[in-house]
């Protein structure tokens, strides 16, 4: 299932993030993103299972030339944010992720940001 929302990596949480008002910008961005993602899943009636396939498509910077964008579209994204932090961001969908026992995750460059999440039931 494709979700048209730009992926966000989960920031490192500190104790201070629980009570600090307003929260740090990266924490505010993540909380907003997680609320939107949760709502998109509810609207689509999508419920993650215990085996997941994830694809994160990150938007290319506007500063890149058209030639470089055309070259990099669909290529693996090998810079920050790290893939493990992208996967951690899906805690918004799965409150108890200890039940997930199989996970495939990839990240790519694309013209616009979106996420593909599929249940892999064999």
Q: At which residue positions do the language-model features occur?
A:
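Acidic, proline/glycine-enriched N-terminal capping motif
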Residues: 1-122
